[in-house]
C-alpha cells in the first residue's frame, strides 16, 4: 500500500480570477528604448464596460 500524501492547494497558488482593471495599469513601469507605442480602437460587446474591452 502506498503512503498517503496531503496536497495543500493554497501554497504558492491561489485559484480565482482577478478583476482586470486591477492588473492592467502598472504605474512604476519604466519605458525602454525597445518599447513600441500602438494605438488601437476597440469596440466592446454589449454589456462589457469600455475599460474592460481594451
From Swiss-Prot:
<dbReference type="GO" id="GO:0019253">
    <property type="term" value="P:reductive pentose-phosphate cycle"/>
</dbReference>
<protein>
    <recommendedName>
        <fullName>Ribulose bisphosphate carboxylase large chain</fullName>
        <ecNumber>4.1.1.39</ecNumber>
    </recommendedName>
</protein>
<keyword id="KW-0113">Calvin cycle</keyword>
<feature type="modified residue" description="N-acetylproline">
    <location>
        <position position="3"/>
    </location>
</feature>
<keyword id="KW-0007">Acetylation</keyword>
<dbReference type="GO" id="GO:0009853">
    <property type="term" value="P:photorespiration"/>
</dbReference>
<comment type="function">
    <text>RuBisCO catalyzes two reactions: the carboxylation of D-ribulose 1,5-bisphosphate, the primary event in carbon dioxide fixation, as well as the oxidative fragmentation of the pentose substrate in the photorespiration process. Both reactions occur simultaneously and in competition at the same active site.</text>
</comment>
<keyword id="KW-0120">Carbon dioxide fixation</keyword>
<keyword id="KW-0602">Photosynthesis</keyword>
<dbReference type="GO" id="GO:0004497">
    <property type="term" value="F:monooxygenase activity"/>
</dbReference>
<keyword id="KW-0150">Chloroplast</keyword>
<comment type="similarity">
    <text>Belongs to the RuBisCO large chain family. Type I subfamily.</text>
</comment>
<comment type="subunit">
    <text>Heterohexadecamer of 8 large chains and 8 small chains.</text>
</comment>
<keyword id="KW-0601">Photorespiration</keyword>
<dbReference type="InterPro" id="IPR036422">
    <property type="entry name" value="RuBisCO_lsu_N_sf"/>
</dbReference>
<keyword id="KW-0503">Monooxygenase</keyword>
<dbReference type="GO" id="GO:0016984">
    <property type="term" value="F:ribulose-bisphosphate carboxylase activity"/>
</dbReference>
<keyword id="KW-0488">Methylation</keyword>
<keyword id="KW-0456">Lyase</keyword>
<feature type="propeptide">
    <location>
        <begin position="1"/>
        <end position="2"/>
    </location>
</feature>
<dbReference type="InterPro" id="IPR033966">
    <property type="entry name" value="RuBisCO"/>
</dbReference>
<feature type="modified residue" description="N6,N6,N6-trimethyllysine">
    <location>
        <position position="14"/>
    </location>
</feature>
<dbReference type="GO" id="GO:0009507">
    <property type="term" value="C:chloroplast"/>
</dbReference>
<keyword id="KW-0560">Oxidoreductase</keyword>
<keyword id="KW-0934">Plastid</keyword>
